[in-house]
């Protein structure tokens, strides 16, 4: 059985090489052939994706952010926490070291301290409130998933979902039961092409969501690298006990470059994790996902999902 498998694998690779040579496209001209063992269904591929991130409950990291929106462009560093299912914190610092924004959401309450406008926005943790900073109208759980490298998955039926190999990666089409469609690009780890599909590690490369025929957002994920679990948080004065990591040991990959694009508004935001700065399952202290009103700021309630 092993000899037959190796012969089949050799024939597949040889056939691909001959096809590339015949077309005269050179070494880089042909996309990778599909793995020897392929996912039977879209849900099988999604199951492997979830399995690869079972240990990654949340991420803490420092990233470069480059946000291009109708209101202008913002560049700086962002210190972020994103913890499943829907808790986030962003502290955005300018190139000069000044804090520009602090956004917190515990999945229920949204708060944004805008130092430039001297305004403290607060309200429910709706997609459009989160988009005040991210410019991407996605729910908190979807944002957390993408920042961890996992695709949010729309509600769908197994029978309606489809999967095919398309130019070096899998392409999953998920017609939702709620008048939406999702397209997910999933790649296979280069070291796992000859493993059974049940053992292959996968990488989410792209996500596109369309709502009622209108493109909602696209996400491009690249530069995948393994990272480790964060160490315990130690009180330097030795008064409080160490705070342990919020999850198990984990060495899953994370995409170090995540780009969000919203076609109808032309908004574009790029997160690039700094090497060595991203950690899984960070220690969490009370108040991480909320914030007090800074002095000297006016308060403004916002609930843009609610009709006037």
Regions found by a protein language model. Name each.
Residues 29-77, 243, 302-308:
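N-terminal leader/targeting segments and the immediate start of mature chains
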Residues 86-142, 271:
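An acidic-aromatic
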Residues 160-307:
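Gly/Pro-enriched, hydrophobic low-complexity segments
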């Amino acid at each position: 059985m092993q000899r037959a498998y190796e012969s089949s694998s050799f024939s597949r690779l040889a056939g691909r090489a001959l096809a590339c040579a015949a077309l005269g496209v050179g070494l880089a001209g042909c996309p990778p052939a599909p793995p020897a063992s392929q996912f039977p269904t879209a849900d099988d591929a999604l199951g492997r994706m979830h399995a690869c991130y079972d240990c990654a409950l949340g991420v803490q990291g420092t990233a470069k952010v480059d946000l291009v929106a109708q209101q202008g462009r913002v560049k700086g560093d962002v210190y972020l926490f994103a913890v499943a299912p829907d808790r986030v914190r962003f502290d955005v610092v300018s190139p000069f070291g000044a804090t520009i924004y602090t956004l917190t959401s515990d999945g229920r309450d949204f708060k944004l301290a805008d130092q430039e406008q001297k305004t403290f926005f607060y309200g429910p943790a709706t997609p459009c409130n989160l988009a005040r900073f991210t410019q991407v109208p996605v729910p908190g759980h979807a944002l957390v998933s993408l920042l961890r490298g996992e695709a949010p998955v729309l509600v769908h039926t197994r029978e309606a979902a489809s999967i095919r190999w398309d130019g070096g990666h899998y392409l999953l089409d998920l017609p939702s039961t709620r008048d939406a469609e999702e397209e997910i690009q999933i790649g296979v780890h280069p070291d796992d092409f000859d493993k059974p599909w049940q053992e292959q590690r996968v990488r989410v490369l792209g996500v596109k969501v369309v709502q009622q025929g209108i493109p909602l957002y696209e996400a491009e994920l690249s530069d995948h690298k393994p990272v480790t679990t964060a160490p315990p948080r130690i009180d330097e004065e030795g008064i409080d006990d160490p705070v342990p990591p919020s999850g198990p040991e984990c060495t899953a990959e994370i995409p170090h470059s995540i780009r969000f694009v919203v076609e109808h508004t032309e908004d574009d935001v790029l997160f690039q994790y700094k090497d060595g700065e991203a950690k899984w399952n960070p220690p969490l202290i009370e108040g991480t996902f909320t914030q007090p009103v800074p002095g000297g700021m006016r308060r403004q309630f916002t609930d843009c999902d609610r009709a006037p």
